[in-house]
Regions:
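Flavin (primarily FAD) cofactor-binding/catalytic cores of flavoenzymes
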Residues: 2-63, 116-256, 260-522
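Redox-cofactor-proximal catalytic regions of oxidoreductases
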Residues: 48-116
Length: 522
């Protein structure tokens, strides 16, 4: 139900309509439906700037129909939702496999060929599923829940398509959220409780505002307007370039988005024929590690094992030892994908032996660094990247990105300037008509989000020590009746939860469940 008149009053306003919002709302409605006591109807408004509610970019139309989960279903899906989700996959199998066959192209054909035998055997835990399936499942379950809670007169859910830009704390212990509609007009809603569920901060820009209107194609965010749209734009661009050697793509970053882009490119025959080279530059020069069976079950991280025998050590010693042992493992041909669980269990054990202050220091200072060291990805994604390397279509470049500037000889192409692994400042010899930013998200103290900046400026939210999330109480409050869910909880450290990132579906589900229980009990 739309709600577009100014300053409408609600009990709860959820700012953001992606997966953090939908999972929290689903838990909240389930709790309301399970109550055995009468209560007044709760009014809830959900505000989302994109024209798609409940899925966010990972599980919605901004991703590809061929975008896969980065880990297997067994690791990805929330444990409490697993039986229901697998039942849904089974019951709707003909529909979604038909959809893949009709709209998924070569990538879907290969995915079905590789995974259908496991689907028939019900071996779901081992499959890297198309992500849109989880988005469709959550959407369906939430729509059913909304209908039920409305029918019982327990809650009424309103939707507004607009961008939240500011939040004002009123004298009567309520909040006024200022919203910018698509037409540029500003409206407001008032609510007693606010749930901030806006997802991750904006992507960190690599394009200088002073660069002006360069002739090359610069894609600031791989998922805006959508990853398939951007691949189509590159294909059209390449078709107009007669010189094969100039049909190059520069990707800045080597994260999961980079890997997904490579996977999709590998299965797009049209653009593959046109493509000369993809250069992916990053500090590490590495993509996330391939998830493999435990190939080295008896491998010993000797320095970490020795550290375990010490009575006292610091968070810095722990991080240094992790990096030292990982370097030794790599030198022996053992990668994190082969020994992930041994390493993780050992690090958790050593982390728990630290005192409270040192544990918090590890979370704040080294948590994200450790996460980047142990990044993993599924076989389909890593194999596609390896195939591109073998076909001499992909080079992984280790170095520090400096800038992309328009070529002096032909502004329709970008030129990469970088510092090499040997500390030399270099210009890459290739020209790039397409540049894709996969460098990650902004830190909060240098954020371009109007809402985030206003929350900090007014003192409603305080940036935590990781610079990736907000300080919250054990009730997830950044301020009185102002709750945070999703990625902006990154760095949370209290007696209930200790996460240095809250980006995967399992963690978001857990937080949403806990917050819903808090709200219902209030």
């Amino acid at each position: 139900m739309p709600a577009n008149s100014p300053k409408q009053q609600f009990d709860i306003a959820i700012l953001g309509g992606g997966i953090s919002s939908s999972l929290t709302l689903l838990h909240l409605i389930r709790n309301l439906l399970s109550l055995n006591r009468p209560q007044k109807e709760i009014s809830i408004v959900v505000v989302e700037k994109q024209n798609e509610f409940w899925k966010g970019f990972p599980y919605g139309k901004r991703s590809s129909i061929n975008s896969l989960t980065i880990t297997t279903l067994g690791e990805f899906v929330p444990e409490k939702e697993k039986k229901s989700f697998i039942g849904w996959l089974d019951s709707t199998q003909d529909k979604w496999i038909g959809l893949l066959k009709t709209h998924g192209g070569d990538a879907s054909v290969k995915w079905i060929e590789n995974n259908y035998p496991m689907i028939q055997k019900k071996q779901w835990d081992e499959i890297y599923i198309p992500r849109f399936l989880f988005g469709d499942y959550v959407d369906e379950k939430l729509q059913e829940a909304i209908q039920n809670v409305r029918a019982k007169g327990l809650a009424n859910i309103h939707l507004i398509e607009a961008e939240a830009t500011n939040l004002l704390k009123k004298d009567n212990a309520q909040y006024e959220a200022e919203l910018k509609e698509k037409n540029g007009e500003t409206i407001s809603v008032v609510a007693g409780k606010i749930i901030l569920a806006i997802g991750s901060p904006p992507v960190k820009s690599i394009q200088s505002p002073l660069s002006g209107n360069s002739g090359y194609l610069y894609i600031e965010d791989a998922y805006l307007p959508g990853i398939e749209n951007n691949i189509d734009s590159i294909a059209q661009l390449f078709s107009a370039i007669t010189d094969q050697n100039k049909r190059n793509i520069l990707i800045v970053g080597s994260n999961a988005s980079t890997l997904e882009f490579l996977y999709l490119i590998q299965h797009e025959s049209e653009i593959k024929k046109l493509l000369n080279k993809i250069i992916a530059i990053s500090y590490s020069g590495l993509l996330p590690h391939r998830i493999t069976p435990n190939n080295f079950p008896n491998y010993q991280f000797s320095n970490l094992i020795s550290l375990r025998e010490k009575k006292n050590y610091t968070s810095t010693e722990l991080m240094d030892t992790i990096e030292k042992d990982m370097q030794i493992a790599y030198a022996k041909g053992v990668h994190i994908g082969d020994t992930y669980y041994q390493l993780s269990d050992l690090v958790v054990e050593l982390l728990n032996k630290l005192d409270e202050n040192q544990q918090k220091d590890f979370h704040s200072t080294y948590g994200w660094r450790f996460t980047k060291l142990i990044r993993r990805a599924g076989a389909e994604y890593r194999d596609a990247a390896e195939e591109l390397i073998q076909q001499k279509k992909l080079d992984l470049l280790k170095g520090k990105f400096l800038s992309v500037v328009a070529s002096k000889n032909d502004p329709a192409f970008g030129v990469l300037n970088y510092i090499s692994s040997t500390s030399q400042e270099l210009t890459h010899p290739l020209l790039f008509p397409a540049v894709i930013n996969c460098s990650g998200f902004e830190e909060l103290n240098a954020c371009s989000s109007e809402l985030i900046n206003n929350l900090v400026k007014q003192g409603l939210c305080t940036i935590n020590s990781t610079n990736r999330g907000f300080e919250v109480s054990e009730k997830f409050e950044a301020n009185d009746n102002l709750y945070i869910v999703g990625p902006l909880l990154g760095g949370i450290f209290n007696n209930k939860l200790r996460y240095w990132h809250v980006e995967n579906a399992r963690r978001i589900y857990t937080v949403g469940e806990m917050l819903a229980e808090i709200l219902v009990n209030q």
